[in-house]
């Protein structure tokens, strides 16, 4: 799979990158209609750090450094994309919107196929007022949410460690 990533935020231990577009294919957040356990216990989190991570070349994964969760890949959060929590659980005041995501076009993503259809994609926040749903970005680049057992696009985030 050939993908492009954009640098979105510098941290002490590395640079965070987010894919420019979604991976080919769609994935459910969970196999059932629930957000119980949040992203941390979701089927998609497990899949991201196994079968999806295995799609990345070793030259890239060797340069990755884990996030605080221990994961090499994760989904973006609602606040990183939109600068606030419109539907999802509230995030720390220290989480800021990534500068490139202030432009709506940079929140939009294609589906990873040669047809280049605009794609809805998952965010990691579970919805406050809806037991079966998680936050998402719609094809127009706006905040929304979707039922966890439905399949949407995936736009992974990873961190490349600083070279000392």
Language model features by range: what are they?
Residues 1-164:
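Collagenous Gly-X-Y triple-helix signature in extracellular proteins
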């Amino acid at each position: 799979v050939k993908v492009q990533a954009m640098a979105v935020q510098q941290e002490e231990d590395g640079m965070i990158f987010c894919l420019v577009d979604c991976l080919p294919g769609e994935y459910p957040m969970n196999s059932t209609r629930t957000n119980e356990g949040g992203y941390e216990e979701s089927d998609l989190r497990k899949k991201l750090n196994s079968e999806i991570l295995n799609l990345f070349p070793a030259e890239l994964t060797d340069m990755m450094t884990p996030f605080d969760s221990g994961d090499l890949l994760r989904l973006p959060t609602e606040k990183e994309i939109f600068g606030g929590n419109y539907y999802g659980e509230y995030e720390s005041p220290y989480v800021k919107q990534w500068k490139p995501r202030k432009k709506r076009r940079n929140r939009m993503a294609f589906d990873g196929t040669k047809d280049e259809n605009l794609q809805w994609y998952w965010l990691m926040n579970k919805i406050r007022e809806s037991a079966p749903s998680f936050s998402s970005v719609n094809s127009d680049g706006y905040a929304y949410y979707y039922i966890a057992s439905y399949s949407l696009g995936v736009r992974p985030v990873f961190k490349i460690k600083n070279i000392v």
